[in-house]
């Protein structure tokens, strides 16, 4: 018996030794390959994490400086975690187009408590199933229905902005945010949020705070373990934000399900104009998910909440930023703003009628303005992926296991693709110029199998809101671009908002 015990113990020791030796050799190779990449000197244990412990309004400068100093391909160590930054379109393409590298990087795990396994953060068979089911919901007829919501909320926005005409300059960002929140609440969940009628929104505050907390946690390796993070003040604030965000969505889902049961409501394309309780009923994203779950698709209440939360986050915060940056750039370049006016005047002929889907399709120059705004200030400044296998990128072999940071902000400033990359020039998106560029030189909505399925929705919303504002006002930006402080959060925002002055546009104004 003793002999067997000794034999088993010896075997266990040998197996353990071989495993640890193999893991040690594997780790040594990983570290060796990573350290061959350009990058700053890393300190023991913490790596380069100390460099990112700066005031939140300085964090973007840290990332920007690294990219300019060490790019187009470089590495940093966040404690034991290797992060590789990419700033060239051909390098980014290698990651985005390949289904092997489809999993999101570590930073996304920090918003998973909020968004769960929705389309932004999910992986595997569940992600594939939901992606396949949800993608058709953004077809033309449904987007046409959503345009009615865009127009209605934009008209409320214009009325709110009228109160700012003739006064001092003001921050237009909160006005746009509340308009976008009204839009996304009605299109995503079928509810009237009325955020534009109220000065404060608990939901909006929670979205902003959870985004900031996520970024602050991501640059502090010692806060990565959940058990530690949950004990901190930041962790407690995060939990409170989750309570607000999940509570809001859960309440709406339950109310919507109850309404469907009471009324036998089956909203489909054929009856979205039916009268419900004396009011026209519009189709909402939530209705489509509930209908799918009733028709055999396996979606639990949690699955539905995760997709609605994802749609709410991606469809309101990103769009708000895109609209505000476009207004800032137009307000800084009156000659380009005048060209937009000319296009709108040609479409509407001086009429104050509501915007239609056909009108939006005719706004070709405004669309180029939006694209150029998103090039200079992409709403999502970086995309993170996990490298699943050793990959040759440029002159380097990057080992599997690295966290890949696809720096969209810098990809969009590649001088080989954009000869004057800092200039605001909507003609960068003339068809003949686009055809000459690398297909991954412009990826504000990501690209490949995990591209944003809501990009058409976002573009139509931005066109509607911007055209509504510009038909009624001339916009003048107060600050210069170099005076703005960019915030490196989940969404690229200016620290102090976008300060503008509005000048009323008279009916007789010539464009």
UniProtKB/Swiss-Prot annotation:
Record's keyword terms, sorted: Endoplasmic reticulum, Heme, Iron, Membrane, Metal-binding, Microsome, Monooxygenase, Oxidoreductase
Induction (record text): By hypertrehalosemic hormone and starvation.
Keyword Heme: yes
Keyword Metal-binding: yes
Gene Ontology CC: endoplasmic reticulum membrane
Membrane-spanning intervals of the chain: none
Reactions mediated catalytically: an organic molecule + reduced [NADPH--hemoprotein reductase] + O2 = an alcohol + oxidized [NADPH--hemoprotein reductase] + H2O + H(+)
EC number: 1.14.14.1
Membrane topology of this protein: Peripheral membrane protein
Binding site for heme: 314, 452
Compartment annotation: Endoplasmic reticulum membrane; Microsome membrane
SUPFAM superfamilies (UniProt xref): Cytochrome P450 (SSF48264)
A Pfam family that the UniProt record links to this protein: p450
Matches recorded under InterPro entries: Cyt_P450, Cyt_P450_CS, Cyt_P450_E_grp-I, Cyt_P450_sf, Cytochrome_P450_Monoox
One Gene Ontology MF term: iron ion binding
Cofactor(s) demanded: heme
Function: Involved in the metabolism of insect hormones and in the breakdown of synthetic insecticides.
Family: Belongs to the cytochrome P450 family.
Name of this chain's protein: Cytochrome P450 4C1
Organism: Blaberus discoidalis (Tropical cockroach)
């Amino acid at each position: 018996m003793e002999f067997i015990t000794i034999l088993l113990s010896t075997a266990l020791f040998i197996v353990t030794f071989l495993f640890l030796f193999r893991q040690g050799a594997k780790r040594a190779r990983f570290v060796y390959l990573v350290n061959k990449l350009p990058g700053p000197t890393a300190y023991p244990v913490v790596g380069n994490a100390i460099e990112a412990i700066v005031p939140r309004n300085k964090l973007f400068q840290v990332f920007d400086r690294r990219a300019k100093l060490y790019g187009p391909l470089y590495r940093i160590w966040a404690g034991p975690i290797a992060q590789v930054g990419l700033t060239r379109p051909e390098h980014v393409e290698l990651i985005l187009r390949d289904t092997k590298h489809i999993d999101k990087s570590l930073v996304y795990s920090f918003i998973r408590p909020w968004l769960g396994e929705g389309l932004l953060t999910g992986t595997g068979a569940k992600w594939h199933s939901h992606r396949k089911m949800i993608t058709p919901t953004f077809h033309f007829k449904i987007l046409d229905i959503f345009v009615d919501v865009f127009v209605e909320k934009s008209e409320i926005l214009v009325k709110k902005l009228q109160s700012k005409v003739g006064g001092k300059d003001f921050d237009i960002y909160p006005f746009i945010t509340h308009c976008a929140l009204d839009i996304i609440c009605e299109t995503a969940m079928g509810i009237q949020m009325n955020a534009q009628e109220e000065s404060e929104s608990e939901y909006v505050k929670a979205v902003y705070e959870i985004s900031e907390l996520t970024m602050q946690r991501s640059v502090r390796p010692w806060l990565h373990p959940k058990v530690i993070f949950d004990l901190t003040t930041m962790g407690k604030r995060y939990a409170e934000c989750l309570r607000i965000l999940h509570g809001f969505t859960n309440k709406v889902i339950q109310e919507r399900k109850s309404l469907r049961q009471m009324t036998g409501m089956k909203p489909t394309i054929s009856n979205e104009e039916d009268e419900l309780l004396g009011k026209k009923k519009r189709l909402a994203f939530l209705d489509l998910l509930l209908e799918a779950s009733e028709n055999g698709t396996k979606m639990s209440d949690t699955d539905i909440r995760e997709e609605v939360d994802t749609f709410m986050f991606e469809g309101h915060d990103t769009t708000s930023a895109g609209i505000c940056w476009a207004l800032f750039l137009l307000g800084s370049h009156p000659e380009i703003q005048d060209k937009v006016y000319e296009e709108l005047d040609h479409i509407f002929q001086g009429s104050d009628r509501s915007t239609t889907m056909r009108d939006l399709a005719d706004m070709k120059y405004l669309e180029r303005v939006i694209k150029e705004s998103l090039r200079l200030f992409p709403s999502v400044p970086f995309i993170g992926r996990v490298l699943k296998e050793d990959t040759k990128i440029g002159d380097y072999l990057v080992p599997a296991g690295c966290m890949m940071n696809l720096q969209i902000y810098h990809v969009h400033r590649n001088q080989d693709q954009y000869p004057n990359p800092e200039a605001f020039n909507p003609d960068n998106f003339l068809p003949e110029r686009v055809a000459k560029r690398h297909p991954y030189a412009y990826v504000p909505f990501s690209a490949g199998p995990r591209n944003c399925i809501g990009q058409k929705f976002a573009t139509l919303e931005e066109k509607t809101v911007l055209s509504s504002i510009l038909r009624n006002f001339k916009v003048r930006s107060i600050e210069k671009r170099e005076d703005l402080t960019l915030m490196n959060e989940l969404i690229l925002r200016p620290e102090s908002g976008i300060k503008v002055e509005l000048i009323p546009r008279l009916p007789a104004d010539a464009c």
